[in-house]
Regions:
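Acidic, glycine-rich catalytic loops of TOPRIM or P-loop NTPase phosphate-binding modules used
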Residues: 3, 10-14, 18-48
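Acidic beta-strand-to-loop metal/phosphate-binding motif
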Residues: 6-8, 46-60
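Short, ordered loop/turn segments at secondary-structure junctions
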Residues: 11, 28-30, 56-58, 80-87
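Short, well-ordered alpha-helical microsegments
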Residues: 13, 61-65
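Short hydrophobic alpha-helical runs that function as membrane-insertion/retention elements
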Residues: 23-26, 51-54, 78-79
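A short acidic, often aromatic-flanked loop/helix-cap motif at beta-alpha or helix-coil junctions
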Residues: 32-33, 85-90, 174-175
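Long, charge-dense
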Residues: 69-121
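C-terminal, charge/polar-rich interaction regions
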Residues: 113-116, 120-190
Length: 190
């Protein structure tokens, strides 16, 4: 399993999710400054798996990176840096203020290299096969999705685990897989 990767926004997350199979959390740019639940989630995930911070290489990216350094134990955080590449993202009409491409504008290999340089850990395939993951079917069987009252049960579990209340069912599944084994999940009393 990868560490949990922290990026600035949804376009960064979309780009990165095509490169790695990892839990990716977005800070919503500076939104993290006013989001106590998201900070708590980062702390929880850092303790469970460790974090890799992968923000843009502009001033704003470094402000966010330094903010995370201040609210999560630095021993649990690795920092991945993308190179300064000048240009503009395809979806934007103009380049960023500093004229640099962000995470979303990087080629897949550049992102992978940045993560490897940061010391990202990859579990080998054997470990993955031997440890079954919590599935959407498990969530359904536990009444946490696809049934009447599922939303209430999810909210109850989210509170019990001290997670952000706005977590979606898929987000909850990611967090559960990052913080516990399938066996532990099946023994949960919800």
């Amino acid at each position: 399993e990868w560490e949990v990767i922290v990026v600035e926004g949804r376009y960064d997350k979309n780009t990165l999710s095509q490169v790695v199979d990892a839990v990716i959390i977005e800070t919503s740019g500076f939104g993290i400054f006013n989001d106590a639940e998201k900070r708590k989630l980062l702390q929880t995930m850092a303790e469970a798996r460790g974090l890799i911070v992968l923000t843009d290489s502009d001033g704003a990216g470094f402000v966010i990176r330094n903010y995370i350094k201040g609210c999560v134990d630095p021993k649990l955080v690795k920092h991945a840096y993308i190179p300064d590449v000048y240009g503009k993202e395809r979806r934007k009409s103009a380049p960023s203020r500093e004229g640099k491409l962000g995470v979303e504008g990087m080629k897949p290999q550049v992102l992978l290299d940045a993560l490897i340089r940061a010391g990202a850990t990859f579990d080998d395939e054997e470990n993955k096969k031997s440890a079954p993951r919590i599935s959407k079917a498990d969530m359904y069987a536990h009444g946490l999705s696809g049934r009447e009252g599922s939303a209430e049960k999810r909210t109850q579990l989210i509170r019990q685990l001290g997670l952000p209340e706005r977590l979606t069912a898929d987000g909850l599944l990611d967090v559960l897989n990052a913080t516990m084994s399938r066996e532990e999940f099946l023994m949960l009393q919800v």
